[in-house]
């Protein structure tokens, strides 16, 4: 069943064929579009796609720095330039964008934090999908936003774009060699060694690794893993924390065929040579984490798997 959004006059808003666009708007301009359309702003507290707690976008934008007041005429001019408003009323495209936003069948929320040579950058992006439409809202500061709408078949390109990082902008790694393509290690060991690095207690590493001796595997693929030497395990765990240049967190939310809400999570860590995924696995009664080399094209694939799990 397709969701129907009503405008201020009670008329149904029809979703038209998608013409991909990417525009930059202030938060005030997005609020103005919602006001003209007669629907809540995307930044208002609205029910989350999976039910449960309210999805207050404003509360998840970080530091709320007050934006300077902008005349309504200037906001309307920006919306006209973006083809979202014409003759003082929202265009069909403008109405369709908000229709998809407020009634998604599937939602993805992304947060990427990267420590560059020039400082730390954090970008947040919210994606909403309904039928053939995808609407994305992204920001780096909570004031200026990039609003994108595109066809669902091109969604994977937008998701991959969110994970793109120019490695030349990162600080150089202090380690001579990168991690193996795949490392499978006990979850509790990863947590303990990470805490030891943060507290500058690396002298505890030898004991921690010895307590889990023989449990860490490494190799070129998940099907070609061999037991790693304790010395290598110690180095890799220290490297994972010390060489970290950022992280990526993604959540996929939707409902299964019975209407029950669900969510799937993707976690990546950025090292000097690129992304690594962190995936929980179970082996011989141990709770393990598989640390696997990733590229930007792998993100939409992982999210597609999570989406299939959520909606099946």
Predicted regions: what is each one?
Residues 2-80, 84-87, 95-96, 103:
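Short, amphipathic alpha-helical interface elements at domain boundaries
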Residues 8-9, 207, 251, 306:
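Low-complexity, intrinsically disordered/propeptide-like segments
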Residues 61-95, 174-230, 307-312:
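Charged, compositionally biased non-catalytic regions
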Residues 72-73, 77, 82-162, 286:
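Accessory beta->alpha helical hairpin/"wing" motif in late/C-terminal subdomains of nucleic-acid enzymes
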Residues 92-132, 220-265:
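Extended, Lys/Arg-enriched charged tracts that mediate electrostatic binding to polyanionic substrates
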Residues 134-200, 204-206, 216-217, 277-312:
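Mixed-charge, glycine-accented linear interaction segment located at domain edges/termini
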Residues 225-312:
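Long, compositionally biased intrinsically disordered regions
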């Amino acid at each position: 069943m397709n969701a129907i959004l009503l405008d201020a006059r009670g008329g149904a808003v029809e979703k038209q064929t998608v013409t991909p666009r990417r525009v930059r708007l202030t938060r005030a301009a997005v609020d103005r579009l919602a006001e003209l359309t007669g629907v809540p702003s995307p930044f208002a507290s609205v029910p989350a796609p999976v039910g449960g707690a309210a999805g207050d976008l404003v509360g998840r934008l970080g530091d709320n720095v007050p934006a300077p007041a902008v005349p309504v005429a200037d906001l309307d001019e920006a919306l006209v330039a973006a083809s979202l408003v014409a003759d003082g009323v929202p265009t069909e495209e403008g109405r369709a964008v908000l229709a998809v936003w407020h009634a998604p069948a599937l939602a993805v929320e992304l947060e990427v934090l990267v420590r560059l040579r020039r400082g730390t950058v954090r970008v947040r992006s919210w994606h909403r999908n309904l039928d053939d439409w995808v609407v994305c809202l992204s920001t780096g500061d909570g004031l200026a936003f990039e609003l994108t709408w595109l066809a669902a078949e091109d969604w994977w390109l937008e998701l991959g774009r969110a994970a793109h990082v120019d490695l030349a902008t990162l600080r150089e790694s202090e380690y001579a060699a990168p991690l193996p393509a795949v490392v499978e290690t006990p979850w509790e060991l990863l947590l303990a060694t990470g805490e030891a690095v943060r507290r500058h207690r690396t002298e505890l590493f030898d004991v921690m690794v010895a307590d889990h001796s023989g449990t860490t595997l490494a190799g070129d693929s998940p099907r070609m893993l061999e037991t790693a030497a304790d010395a290598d395990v110690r180095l890799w765990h220290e490297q994972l924390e010390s060489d970290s240049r950022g992280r990526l967190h993604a959540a996929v939310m939707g409902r299964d065929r019975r209407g029950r809400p669900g969510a799937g999570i993707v976690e990546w860590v950025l090292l000097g040579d690129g992304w690594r995924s962190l995936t929980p696995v179970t082996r011989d009664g141990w709770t393990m984490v598989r640390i696997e080399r990733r590229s930007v094209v792998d993100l939409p694939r992982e999210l597609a798997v999570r989406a299939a799990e959520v909606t099946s």
